[in-house]
Amino acid sequence: MAKTCLKVKALRKPKFKVRAYTRCMVCGRPHSVYRKFGLCRICLREKAHRGELPGVTKSSW
């Protein structure tokens, strides 16, 4: 889990645009965050399995 101070820091608008980075809105994970959902791959998978993300289905081919 990310520290609370890091989550708050990520929400603030940075002084320079290049310093901005994405964090998961649920757990605060800084890596592998999907911009469209604002979630990391782990939280995205859990929410998709529970059906909390409308329109997201498991792929099969």
Swiss-Prot record:
One of its GO terms (biological process) is translation. It comes from the Bacteria. GO terms for cellular component: cytoplasm; small ribosomal subunit. Keywords: Metal-binding, Ribonucleoprotein, Ribosomal protein, RNA-binding, rRNA-binding, Zinc. PROSITE patterns: RIBOSOMAL_S14. Binds 1 zinc ion per subunit. The keyword Ribonucleoprotein applies. Part of the 30S ribosomal subunit. Contacts proteins S3 and S10. Binds 16S rRNA, required for the assembly of 30S particles and may also be responsible for determining the conformation of the 16S rRNA at the A site. This is Small ribosomal subunit protein uS14. It comes from Bifidobacterium animalis subsp. lactis (strain AD011).
